């Protein structure tokens, strides 16, 4: 068994790491630009590389010590677009003050722009080590890294409203059948409760195993997928689907900022209730929305994640160039729920 040494943990917490990473082909959905989800994937990949270079690779930690590396907070800003087949340089700076029970990371992605080193992406993240007793008992964690070990995922909750009481409400059980594919947006009594009186959209979906890791739980990258998916469904519900505005105007959603925090665990094959609420529209140029995710457990709503994402719209000028545009009345009304 690999020993978790003091020197390896010191490297994990104090050494900076630099890695060359390549954008993923899958992340290029419109022309050759890379979407926000795959930009976040690069940030995650850089952090995992840092673990590996410190001598504490994620596979080793799990296979030998029953510890799963989990990102529980990921806050990313896109300063300039990344492209298909682009190699970026990731710089990872870790930190952990005395008494911290998570490891913090600052990650920057640098790209070449006309021969100049350009900071394209900045991100802040937190990671913990989740003790895993699924296949066998994990045992006591190695002492040098024990303070970062948790028996359940979660971050200190931001100031969120308390989850509604489900008293008298029986969750629908027949609207996320396998034939339904993407689940349901209603009618559903729990979705109705969570969206009532808000400029919000609700989606209920059965968590499939490809969205999980370490055999049981939803992971950060899958919440990013969830965020991307609920935006797609929301826009279609408001009559301004991605394809509609592409075909009519060559407009595409453009995302400069996203953040997701995991508050509790969501498990494989649970029903996940995702609520997408438009909170602010800034000068008809960008809008910021909140994503809240819940499961129903023992008859109560349990919030498992919260996040925020900002979008604008970009006009595709040609296969290489785009420019941000102001919302017109149709789009503005759709986002405000005035359709």
PLM regions: where:
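Hot-dog-fold acyl-thioester-processing enzymes
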Residues: 2-71, 126-256, 314-339
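Hydrophobic beta-strand-centered segment that forms part of the acyl-chain substrate-binding groove
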Residues: 51-104, 237-281, 285, 306
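HotDog/MaoC-like acyl-thioester-processing domains
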Residues: 78-89, 93-179, 267-268, 278-339
């Amino acid at each position: 068994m690999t020993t978790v040494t003091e020197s390896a943990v010191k490297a994990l917490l104090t050494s900076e790491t630099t890695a060359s990473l390549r954008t993923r082909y899958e992340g290029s959905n419109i022309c050759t630009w890379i979407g926000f989800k795959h930009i976040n994937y690069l940030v995650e990949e850089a952090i995992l590389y840092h673990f590996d270079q410190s001598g504490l690779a994620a596979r080793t930690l799990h296979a030998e010590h029953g510890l799963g590396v989990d990102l529980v907070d990921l806050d990313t800003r896109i300063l300039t677009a990344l492209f298909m087949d682009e190699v970026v340089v990731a710089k990872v700076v870790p930190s952990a003050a005395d008494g911290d029970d998570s490891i913090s990371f600052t990650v920057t992605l640098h790209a070449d722009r006309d021969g100049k080193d350009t900071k394209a992406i900045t991100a802040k993240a937190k990671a913990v080590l989740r003790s895993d007793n699924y296949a066998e008992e994990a045992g006591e964690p190695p002492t040098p890294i024990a303070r970062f070990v948790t028996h359940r995922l979660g971050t200190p909750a931001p100031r969120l409203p308390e989850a509604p009481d489900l008293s008298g409400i029986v969750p629908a059980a027949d609207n996320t059948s396998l034939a339904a594919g993407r689940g349901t947006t209603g009618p559903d009594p729990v979705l109705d409760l969570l969206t009532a009186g808000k400029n919000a959209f609700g989606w209920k979906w059965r968590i499939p195993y490809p969205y999980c890791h370490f055999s049981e739980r939803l992971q950060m990258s899958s919440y990013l997928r969830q965020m991307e998916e609920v935006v797609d469904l929301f826009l279609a519900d408001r009559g301004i689907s991605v394809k509609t505005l592409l075909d009519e105007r060559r407009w595409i959603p453009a995302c400069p900022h996203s953040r997701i925090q995991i508050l509790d665990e969501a498990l494989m094959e649970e029903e996940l209730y995702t609520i997408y609420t438009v909170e602010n529209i800034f000068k008809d140029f960008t809008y910021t929305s909140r994503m809240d995710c819940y499961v129903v457990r023992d008859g109560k709503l349990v919030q498992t994640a919260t996040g925020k994402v900002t979008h604008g719209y970009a006009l595709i000028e040609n296969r290489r160039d785009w420019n941000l545009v102001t919302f017109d009345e149709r789009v503005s009304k759709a986002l405000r729920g005035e359709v």
